[in-house]
Amino acid sequence: MKFIKYFFGLTFLLPAFLLAQTKATISIENKSNLDFKEAVVSVKWDAIISKFPQIDTSAFVVINDKTKKQIPFQLEHRGLKAIQNLLLQVDVKANTSLSVTVQKGKPEKVIVKTYGRYVPERKDDFAWENDIIAFRAYGKALEKTKEDAYGLDVWVKRTTKMVINDRYKKGDYHIDHGDGMDYYHVGFSLGAGNMAPYINDTIRYSGNYNQWKVLDNGPLRITFQLMFDTWNAGGIKVKAAKTISLDAGSQFNRIENVYSFDGDKPMPVVVGIIKRPEAGIVSLNEKQGMMAYWEPTHLEHGTTGIGVLLTSPVSTMMVSEKQILAKTIVKSNEPIVYYTGAAWDKAGKIANSKQWNSYLENFQKQTQTPLIINLK
């Protein structure tokens, strides 16, 4: 009799146990007063596996429990063979939560919204983009040429399509063919938010990057690394590695720099924005670590806004004739994280300095109060 009772007990428990192995429910909570729109959130893959150990990475879907529609996702590897995170693009209104379920199914094709690559055919450029904006960094082949530049470049766009390959193929990306162009001038500056050592009141530029590695390449997030040869930064031998991420739907890159140099003493660094000779609008907030620059309008091409958000304490901000700078410090082999990005008025989303400053403020608040992820 005891055996029969035990057997029936297992029979009732078995369906619930099996059900728990065939799905994972994720709660995404927004405790802020701001709406998160098209936000890319990260869920630890190990946590998914713990709830859904039999998941087939080629045959699962993520379902919005309210609308029953599929949610776009990406398996993030961070340069490793094993999956590290599940990335989801979601909308979560202020002070609400969203429930989604990971379950077996045939996933819909996700629209590519981020992309980047090494561009050997254009003197070692590395270019990357999302569905809003595009950027590039300069490589070794450009050094000691009349085109040489040190900072980050911006390519403006007014299309959600990926444009990098088409623009390089045409070779005339300084002309607007209807979807944007490259009219941003970098020259011998930090451009659109690059970082460099600042020794004895002088920016100590590195050479251009000499190695690159793509860690993830869309469809929702691109992450890559740029490595720089050792250089003499005002008497300090410095080596640098920069890890850059750009999410779909965002105006901003996340940049994590690691500087290697001798000694325990912190090294001063600056993040900079090139300043135009004509009148633009500069907005600085040292306490918040925020720099915004609404450039003067560039002929018929429109107006570009550049912004920087630092996560480390800023000792001072400076406006010179040629650059806008924010000064902070780094320790050897310890990562420093900041955000830099751009907007274009002709893209139709951000039309003036007031809107650009508001975007920066809201973006910073969202990084400080991110969406909260829980698995059930």
In which residue ranges do the predicted regions lie?
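Bacterial Sec-dependent N-terminal signal peptides
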Residues: 1-25
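Alpha-mannosidase-like glycoside hydrolase catalytic domains involved in N-glycan trimming
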Residues: 21-116
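Solvent-exposed beta-strand/loop surfaces of large extracellular or lumenal domains
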Residues: 55-83, 232, 279-295, 304-316
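Extended acidic/polar, glycine-enriched regions
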Residues: 80-121, 269-281, 287, 291-295, ...
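Beta-strand-rich recognition/accessory modules
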Residues: 85-87, 308-376
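Solvent-exposed N-terminal domain segments of exported/luminal and surface proteins
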Residues: 106-203
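Extended, loop-rich substrate-binding clefts of extracytoplasmic carbohydrate-active enzymes
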Residues: 170-248
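Acidic (Asp/Glu-rich), glycine- and aromatic
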Residues: 240, 251-284
